[in-house]
Amino acid sequence: MTRTLLSWPGGRRLKWLVLAAWIGLLIVLQPLAGKLGDVESNDAAAWLPGNAESTEVLELSEKFQPADTSPTVIVYDRPSGITAADEAKARADATHFADGTGVVGEPYGPVRSDDGKALRTVVNVHLGKDGWEGLNAAAKDMRAIARPSAPDGLGVHVTGPTGYAADSAESFSSADFKLTLVTLLIVVTILVVTYRSPLLWLLPMISAGMSLVISQAIVYLLAKNAGLTVNAQTAMILTVLVLGAATDYALLLVARYREELRRHEDRHEAMAVALRRAGPAIVASAATVAVSMLVLLLAALNSTKGLGPVCAVGVLVGLLSMMTLLPALLVIFGRWVFWPARPKHGTEPDVTRGLWSRIARLVSGRPRAVWVTTSLLLGAVATLAVTLNADGLQQKDGFKTKPESVVGEEILTRHFPAGSGEPMVVIAKGASADQVHAALETVPGVIEVAPPQVKDGLAYVEATLGAGADSPAAMRSVTAARETLARLDGAQARVGGSSAVVHDMREASSRDRGLIIPVILAVVFCILALLLRALVAPLLLIASVVLSFFTALGLAALFFNHVFDFAGADSAFPLWVFVFLVALGVDYNIFLVTRIKEESDRLGTRQGALKGLTSTGGVITAAGLVLAGTFAALATLPLVFIAELGFTVAVGVLLDTMIVRSVLVTALTLDVGRWMWWPHPLARREDPSEDPAVSGMPDSIDSEASTTASR
């Protein structure tokens, strides 16, 4: 039944209905896709779970200050010392700031530093419905006010949370277009080289492009109506994932369609057979990726939780497009779209000895030596993963270049306490206000505690830290404050503020890693076990996935520490890398191992493994190059976290497709033999040949390897 349904999109009449349906969807949903940026939530506090202590403080603080405000710090500096004219300028600016875009309340300052070389003014800005785009507008207004009339030699910088948000928004302002363009160029280049046709690449790209637009529209609707958390990072990941995964599915389908065109004169019949034979593996792999992504719904961190449905939507829409729209387009355009190498009915491709035939011969000679050596080499690189610093990036280390907000913070910390402008906030019972105030003065790292405010039975206390709000020292102060205040009977004190938000995000990331990684491994194992009806093969494949993941982290640590000179990685980085590498690695596992199992049923496991490798090696490599290329496009973006993610996933995918899947897994299968399929009946069937020597490889293996390589 399923195979029959898969063959319908390429039918003589249905192909036009399929095309019309997709065009109709595009017309209806394209306007919504352009609104995705309107529902992005780029405020870190919004990513926290509702039960986080800092989230509770944010909600309770609305009794004492306007909700959804962001502090802006304007710092003035003169190395030789602030002059009277400088101070007059700062006071005049503060008056103008009060009338600026989104400003709430009166500016605080200017305050002179103890060394007399800097001034600081703090202005609160309302986030509004535009989020960080609104903060960008406010920051631009303040810069326009402060800079033009500044006395010669006086430096003026806008920093603090608003400054950082403005610089982040500026970084992303043209990033969507740039990322899409770079990704498309990478995919087109790989497709042209793979197909060796100036025309064929257009059809997968049209299908993938429509998939992206429709995915963005669906994600917009989910974010607007179902509370899905979407930020700029997940929106960009959606772009590269849809274009990469959809193109992977296209490569597999087109390869099988080309093969069937040589066997069937009628292109509709050829497409029906191609869909019946290649479709189940493609559907199974896409469904596995989607289910793996949906495991992220278990995450405590809303930004991570939102990533799962976003990616699942992208993968499933990409699958639907490549199983319906692409087949319709291919049969509409006919054989000529393969020009100049059109597959002719009744012909066979030139038989030459290809790369994967040679690799199969190498692996089959000494399979145990191959998989042991490969595992040891990968394991050696994997040990470098312990040097990866994934304790979290400070804001100042989050940019590949140094924007104004970073420069301003560096100046601020030279002349003022680093935590000024972003205080620790404590909410407690009003009757305990004095106790809380006294207790905060004993907390390590706290240099100043403001007088308590009491309202509606609650006390509000601000404490200034000597360290930067997202520094390790500030994290220790948050922990110490919570431990100290917990000892106050009846105070019910809760600690919030910028430092606590960062602290709680890192705690949530750590919790998510401990829960989600084992669950994903269990889910993937169950899916592979059901698909292969075996237990040994899934266990070995899971082990190879874990090895591939740690090897990718090891290479990432090597490059981050010694080549790119990054300060570290975000606390969510290991989990995101794991999810993508495992979910996408399952794709290639399914493509390879299902073909090995299919051939093993005819030839025995040893010969089936060799034929499976030579049959799929070329297309898996091309698919890996496409996906690695699309994720590598993320490395062109200006933010460190997204660049690190793109680099590591790209490296991991290349490792997975070229070494782990194609060499290690094949060698393991040869060595383990028929027991790979235990307890499936194949495990009890003797191989036709127990000797996988090169001379014993059937001619069909070499022939198909050559066919694959020639494509």
From Swiss-Prot:
Keywords: Cell membrane, Membrane, Transmembrane, Transmembrane helix. It is found in: Cell membrane. The chain crosses the membrane at residues 14-34, 175-195, 199-219, 235-255, 281-301, 313-333, 369-389, 516-536, 540-560, 573-593, 623-643, 645-665. Gene3D superfamilies: Multidrug efflux transporter AcrB transmembrane domain. It is a multi-pass membrane protein. The keyword Endoplasmic reticulum does not apply. Residues 685-711 are annotated as: Disordered. Its main location: membrane. GO terms for cellular component: plasma membrane. Disulfide bonds: none annotated. Belongs to the resistance-nodulation-cell division (RND) (TC 2.A.6) family. MmpL subfamily. This is Putative membrane protein ActII-3. The gene is actII-3.
